[in-house]
């Protein structure tokens, strides 16, 4: 196996482990919300958190099946990370903003400008969409609505 394939396999396994940690953090935040330690609307958190956790766990299952050696695995991992953050940011706009750096950081492990650029563009488009989706179906944020109204 050449060094490039070995690096890609290693990056796939590392990214999958990172997303498992993200899934555990989401599960912990969900439990803290259910026990009313975090103050988030349960009608938003209860339907979205299982979907987010599912998206974050899919790469670990794929890597377990394939060993992370297939060429398409990196695309599946980055797709799942972007979609998980998109759902999080749509449901909770205030809390999902910083999480948008995660897919880009994961894409940097592959040492591919094209892949990082593609991840950045997808993240920017979905981040913009999540702001508008979050205004209407996500957690209420009057400041976000005022900013959208007064900016044009």
Where are each of the predicted segments found?
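Residue-level signature of transmembrane alpha-helical entry/exit and packing/kink sites
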Residues: 73-74, 78, 97, 142, ...
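N-terminal membrane insertion elements
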Residues: 109, 114-119, 124, 128-152
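Transmembrane helix interruption/hinge and helix-loop junction motifs
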Residues: 89-95, 111-115
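Short, Lys/Arg-rich, polar N-terminal cytosolic tail immediately upstream
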Residues: 1-10
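Hydrophobic transmembrane alpha-helices and their membrane-interface boundaries in multi-pass
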Residues: 14-92, 99-105, 123-127
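General secondary-structure edge motif
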Residues: 4, 87, 108-109
């Amino acid at each position: 196996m050449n060094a490039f394939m070995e690096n890609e396999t290693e990056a796939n396994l590392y990214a999958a482990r990172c997303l498992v940690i993200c899934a555990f953090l989401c599960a912990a935040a969900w439990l803290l919300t259910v026990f009313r330690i975090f103050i988030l609307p349960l009608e938003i958190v209860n339907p979205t958190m299982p979907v987010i956790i599912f998206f974050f766990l899919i790469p670990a299952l794929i890597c377990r099946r394939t060993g992370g050696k297939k060429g398409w695995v990196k695309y599946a991992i980055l797709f799942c990370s972007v979609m998980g953050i998109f759902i999080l940011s749509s449901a909770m706009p205030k809390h999902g903003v910083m999480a948008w750096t995660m897919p880009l950081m994961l894409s940097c492990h592959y040492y591919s400008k094209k892949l990082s650029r593609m991840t950045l563009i997808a993240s920017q488009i979905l981040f913009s969409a999540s702001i508008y989706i979050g205004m209407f179906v996500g957690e209420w944020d009057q400041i976000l609505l005022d900013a959208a109204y007064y900016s044009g």
